[in-house]
Regions:
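Predominantly soluble domains enriched in secretory-pathway, periplasmic, or organellar proteins
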Residues: 1-286
Length: 286
């Protein structure tokens, strides 16, 4: 298992394994700041372009224009498609990994910030941002299957074993995080728990039963079926980038520019692997 890290000032870096040293990856992108990885390739997003690379050797496959206000990237499990979420055009785009050609596009929300694919790669879930909605679309065609209405702006969403998990910014005395679940066949989301602070990132754990959620108050692990928190790391507040592989997690912290590698079962087992400015990291699992 390797790590790849993009930093807007320091470029792209790779660690050969969990404890290995970092080596710089040649990358011509201006201000790279997003990464995602799949079974055969990795995609790095910058201000104007995205670059697709092979997982082994990190050789260039293709270049493609970055969606305006690029907010998120993900790769299909088969490696054929790259999905780009645009926070300025309020849309999601499907491009071919091999050529960068734009083949599908669909509107999603207002200033959307997050999206993810299910395990099969056939459904894409997009959080609608400032719109009180989330959207379930087919992949790669981006045909809308369902619009999910939430009671407040939806900033992150994911697939768990019991359906969908939706993370929203709710208003009260202060803005806080409201987490909802939506079971298959049910008409509306059910509130699971309120968390302090505005919402950051979300990652569903590999077992499909837990979730890492970052808010202004820290990085937390949620037991979804029971609706209770298992732990909280206050020094990892507002992590925009979260990803898991097996028992390990990578947290890209927005406030302090750190990339932290930790066990999501034993969060005290952690270390900082990189410090930068605008950072985003993911696992290379191929």
């Amino acid at each position: 298992m390797s790590l790849i890290i993009a930093d807007a000032r320091q470029g792209v870096w790779k660690a050969a394994d969990e404890g290995g040293p970092l080596t710089e990856v040649a990358c011509a992108l201006e201000a790279p700041y997003l990464t995602c990885a799949g079974s055969a390739c990795v995609c790095v997003g910058g201000c104007r372009e995205c670059l697709c690379l092979t997982c082994h050797g990190l050789r260039e496959i293709s270049r493609m224009p970055a969606a305006p206000g690029l907010a998120a990237l993900c790769l299909s499990p088969c490696g054929r498609y790259v999905y780009q979420l645009s926070a300025e055009a309020d849309s999601v785009h499907t491009r071919l990994t091999a050529t960068g050609e734009l083949i599908f596009a669909a509107p999603v929300g207002v200033f959307p910030r997050a999206m993810c694919l299910d395990a099969s790669g056939r459904r894409l879930l997009a959080a609608g941002g400032a719109a009180d909605e989330a959207y379930l679309l087919t992949a790669p065609e981006l045909v809308r299957e369902r619009t999910i209405h939430t009671q407040s702006p939806c900033f992150a969403a994911g697939f768990w074993r019991g359906g969908l998990l939706l993370v929203c910014a709710a208003e009260g005395e202060d803005i806080h995080t409201a987490v909802y679940t939506l079971a298959p066949g049910t008409p509306r989301p059910r509130k699971l728990i309120d968390l302090p602070g505005q919402p950051g990132g979300l990652c569903i754990c590999p077992d499909g039963m837990g979730a890492l959620i970052s808010t202004r108050d820290g990085l937390m692990k949620l037991d979804i079926p029971r609706g209770r928190l298992l732990w909280n790391l206050p020094d990892l507040a507002l992590c925009a980038g979260l990803c898991c592989y097996g028992p390990m997690a990578l947290a890209s912290a927005t406030l302090n520019g750190q990339v932290r590698l930790l066990s999501h079962h034993k969060p005290w087992l952690s270390r900082t692997v990189f410090t930068g400015t605008d950072v985003h990291a993911c696992f290379l699992t191929a």
